Amino acid sequence: MKCQVLVDWLTFSVKEKDPAIVIQEYLGMEPELFQDAGYGLLGYNRVLRFSDICVCCEGRENKFFKDMGVCVSMSGNGCRTFETMSKLTRDKGTSPFPVLFQHLRADESANVSRIDIACDDQDGYLNMEQIVEKVQTNELNSRMTKRSVIVSYDGTRRSGSTVYIGAPSSDFRIRIYDKALEEGVEGHWVRVELVMRQKNANAFIEQAVSAPSIWKLAAQVVNDKISFIERDDSNISRCTVCEWWREFVDELEAVRLVARCVVQHSVERIENWVDAQIG
């Protein structure tokens, strides 16, 4: 089984104004790890940073923006660092994200402004050329009417394509691309990425806490939002779902949320640094 589901971006804010408390209670990490970045971000004057995890504090409040509290934003690499360094779970083989989601749900002041869920196919279910063709010939069933295909070139050579389902300004968008090509690695690796903002992001967190598993929830969201079809009926809702897409979604339901993925830096080096800094 080579399909996997992982959290690939997370941005949330809470009313708590002390960044050290947020780092300890919500992230399960040591505040001493985070250093002043020397710049502001997302409407905050100060950023404490460790790897690609940014903890923003001292909000630039005015009559429009009040009680900004603390905002935490982690990119894909930051998410992997969080999984590696967080003490929210004792089992190093268990992702700390479900515990973080429980904390966010329990805090009525918490707001999740963005979460990306990556659904990776490394087993050969998805073919980018086939997906591009389906989008261009409108052989897909989705309530999202905005669709686009971005083709990249290296000189005159076509080097890859990215499919977008949903409007750039919407609170929900799907991005499909060749992750192996992006990372410059061998083998098959196609990523279906769910980009959720504001209302959809908060709804996902809410459902994730009560869902049997985050990976099953991700599969349900994918299945609800889009399916690639064979045009074998005049009524699109009765068209046959492509076997390769059905198999991919079925496989997603069977996988576990990935934890402790390899980060783009040496975890051992970080742990040694932590020992040196905080004993």
Residue ranges, per PLM feature:
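Structured, helix-rich domain cores that form ligand/interaction pockets
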Residues: 1-266, 270-277
